């Protein structure tokens, strides 16, 4: 996503320059260097490495899976996840399952959320260990217990999940 967004920004700058706007090259470089999209492959902790990604549809999971393959090649990844029931979660997890060592499911705080137990039952089809947790805090504790200090965990599936994960990480 970030590369596509940068390409759109650069194209916009080119169009504005063609229309007479003066946009300093150093400002463009600084803007690109400082650009960040919280909740998109965002590293929030080390030992173990914890990555947040708010991807909540199949296209976002394609991007997340590509980032995992690029930046964590061959590494087993613990996946803490929760999803809204009205999302196409079958196609979402088809992208992620080949890269997951294990899944930990939680229920996001949203009336449309899929129950962690239902999601766990669905994810078992991929043949990976799956643990359903009653609370997000319990899921974060389980994720930290299941991920070695030199390992990586990815928290994904819903933007509604990420804030609660960050709060739970601060408390454990």
Listing of model-derived features with the role each one plays in the protein:
Residues 67-68, 122, 171-172:
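Glycine-rich, phosphate-binding/catalytic loops in enzymes
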Residues 161-163:
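Short, active-site-adjacent cap segments at secondary-structure transitions
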Residues 49-51, 58, 93-152:
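C-terminal helical cap/extension that packs against the catalytic core
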Residues 1-102:
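Nucleotide phosphate-binding/pyrophosphate-handling subdomain across enzymes
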Residues 158:
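Active-site-proximal loop/hinge segments that shape catalytic or ion-binding/gating pockets
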